[in-house]
Amino acid sequence: VHAGISGNWCVKNKIAGSLAMVIEKNEEFTLGDFKITPFEVPHDSFDNVGYKIEAEGVTFCLMTDVGIVTDEMKPFISAADYLVIEANHDPEMLRNGNYPQHLQDRILGPRGHLSNRDCGIAIAENASPLLKHVWLCHLSDENNHPELAKKTVEQVLASYGILAGVDFQVDVLKRKVPTGVFDLVP
């Protein structure tokens, strides 16, 4: 149980103490062969975290519900062999869509969600030569679509001299369908 929700009455009463382990941000813990480091991601809900997971010489990083990529988050991207990162929206689709102004402002704010472009910039400015695969996730149903997210991220990468499919693979995770199984090799 993440420390931020350990105080939640429902969580306390539904998980036996012997089955729960409170985890803290930026404190590595182990689970079997996995070394896991939770790290803070800025979002307007309570106490969000991303995860760096290491096992058998592979580093996997997951970050979603990300308003902006902070300096504290950048080393986690840089360490990743495999990265799952939010590409939530296209700002033009958001501004021209049906969301009320206050919700648009929330999504576009520093504790909202990453746009496709900002996702691409975060990858381009922080990825290491070790990066093998990026999966774009948490796409908005109303303000994005998979082809646009991938195209925008790949265009941003290209503007930095990074070629998707050559330097590393970029794919989009489906919103409501389980993915296949991926073999994460060192």
Sequence positions of predicted segments:
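Glycine-/small-residue-rich active-site loops that bind phosphorylated ligands and cofactors
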Residues: V1, H43, V69, D141-E142
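Active-site HxH/HxHxD metal-binding segment of metal-dependent hydrolases
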Residues: V1-E28
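Short glycine-/acidic-enriched loop or helix-start segments at secondary-structure transitions
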Residues: S6, V11-K12, N48, E72-M73, ...
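Generic structural signal for residues in well-ordered beta-strands
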Residues: A20-M21, I36, V170
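Cap/insert and terminal regions of metallo-dependent hydrolase folds
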Residues: D71-V170
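Short, flexible loop segments at boundaries between secondary-structure elements
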Residues: D167-T179
